[in-house]
């Protein structure tokens, strides 16, 4: 029988399956151009190994996966997933380009994300860290080792073992480390003081930390401690933070989102504590000591709000292509949904001459 904490952690880990199913859907429906060739590897790995994760059986894992991956996603969900993926990819690639590949990416709660593999195809020298719960990291590691293309991209000769039961899965190491790729099976809540837990981390190179709907599952205190951990480990060198997460806006739609999350056993404490861009900016500046903050919501990124300076996130030609894939009649509905998700960039550095100039390639609501 699972403890209350184990049950809660299982629910949080399950959100990675939600994200993967959304990525799978937009990939299948041709939103991604070029398509993501690695999504299927993560899906197949979950199909093999979810049954061995805490709280699952062969039957319950099969039901969970069938419900997520066989049901058609609504166009409004596909559009939001596309905008999220596209915007984050653009910032990450611009960061890598500006620092000419001599940089480091840290993806918190990376789970089934495939961004690292895409980046290695064109930026072989970037250092990439992925951190997630040990179980999630194991599923990802096994996906990597079962595909020779991904093995070559990350730089490992290790091959996949034979795992046929929970005991073998439980005893299997979640860690994978190469010269440029580091997969860490770590609960973020255990990162409290800078130490040797982050194998391969290089504090001397510019670093971008990504939290894509991850820190929002922590309490406000845990959120702040996690942010402070990374600013301390930066050792006064340049570190940028790219954060994507929901916010309540203290309105009726936000209340509906809260009830929906609670019905799934999820409690996003920062969702209402920092309900809008202004309160989040204050929290990140005053409690997390970030500077040069840029904040926007996904409605703005998607072009559902009027921009004054023309620095659009997605050009008209690309949006024209996307609009032809699936029709969305209720423009007000998607605008309202996207307003409740924010994208934030901030930086921590003691080096006054170093910053990420490319972040102003795009227009932001608040800076």
UniProtKB/Swiss-Prot annotation:
EC number(s) given by UniProt? 2.1.1.233
Write out the residues that bind S-adenosyl-L-methionine: 84, 109, 132, 187-188, 212
UniProt-listed Pfam families:
LCM
Q: Which SUPFAM superfamilies match?
A: S-adenosyl-L-methionine-dependent methyltransferases (SSF53335)
Q: Name one GO biological process term.
A: methylation
Q: What class of enzyme is it?
A: transferase
Keyword Chloroplast applies: no
Catalytic activity annotation: [phosphatase 2A protein]-C-terminal L-leucine + S-adenosyl-L-methionine = [phosphatase 2A protein]-C-terminal L-leucine methyl ester + S-adenosyl-L-homocysteine
Keyword annotations: Methyltransferase, S-adenosyl-L-methionine, Transferase
An example Gene Ontology molecular-function term: protein C-terminal leucine carboxyl O-methyltransferase activity
Family stated for the protein in its record: Belongs to the methyltransferase superfamily. LCMT family.
PANTHER family given in the database record: LEUCINE CARBOXYL METHYLTRANSFERASE, LEUCINE CARBOXYL METHYLTRANSFERASE 1
Q: What is the role of the protein in this entry?
A: Methylates the carboxyl group of the C-terminal leucine residue of protein phosphatase 2A catalytic subunits to form alpha-leucine ester residues.
Question: This protein is called what?
Answer: Leucine carboxyl methyltransferase 1
Q: What's the source species for this entry?
A: Candida albicans (strain SC5314 / ATCC MYA-2876) (Yeast)
């Amino acid at each position: 029988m699972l403890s209350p904490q184990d049950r809660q952690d299982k629910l949080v880990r399950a959100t990675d399956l939600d994200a993967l199913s959304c990525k799978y859907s937009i990939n299948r429906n041709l939103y991604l151009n070029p398509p993501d060739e690695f999504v299927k590897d993560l899906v197949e790995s979950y199909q093999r190994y979810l049954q061995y994760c805490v709280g699952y059986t062969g039957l319950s894992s099969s039901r969970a996966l069938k419900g997520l991956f066989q049901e058609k996603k609504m166009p409004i969900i596909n559009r939001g997933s596309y905008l999220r993926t596209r915007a984050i990819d653009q910032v990450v690639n611009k960061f890598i380009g500006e620092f000419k590949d001599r940089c480091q990416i840290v993806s918190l709660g990376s789970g089934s994300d495939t961004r690292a593999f895409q980046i290695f195809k064109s930026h072989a020298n970037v250092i990439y860290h992925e951190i997630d719960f040990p179980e999630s990291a194991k599923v990802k590691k096994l996906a990597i080792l079962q595909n020779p293309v991904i093995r070559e991209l990350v730089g490992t000769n290790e091959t996949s073992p034979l795992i046929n039961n929970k005991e073998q899965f439980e005893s299997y190491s979640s860690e994978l480390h190469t010269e440029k790729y580091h997969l860490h099976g770590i609960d973020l809540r255990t990162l409290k003081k800078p130490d040797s837990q982050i194998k391969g981390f290089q504090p001397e190179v510019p670093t971008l930390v990504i939290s894509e709907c991850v820190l929002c599952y922590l309490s406000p205190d845990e959120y702040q401690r996690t942010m402070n951990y990374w600013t301390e480990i930066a050792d006064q060198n340049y570190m940028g933070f790219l954060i994507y997460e929901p916010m309540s806006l203290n309105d009726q739609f936000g209340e509906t989102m809260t009830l929906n999350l609670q019905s799934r056993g999820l409690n996003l404490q920062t969702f209402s504590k920092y309900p809008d861009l202004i309160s989040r900016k204050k929290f990140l500046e005053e409690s997390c000591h970030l500077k040069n903050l840029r904040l926007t919501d996904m409605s703005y990124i998607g072009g559902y709000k009027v921009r004054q300076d023309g620095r659009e996130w997605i050009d008209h030609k690309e949006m024209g292509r996307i609009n032809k894939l699936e029709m969305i009649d209720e423009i007000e509905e998607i605008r309202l949904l996207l307003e409740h998700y924010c994208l934030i960039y901030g930086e921590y550095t003691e080096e006054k001459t170093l910053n990420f100039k490319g972040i102003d390639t795009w227009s932001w609501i608040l800076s």
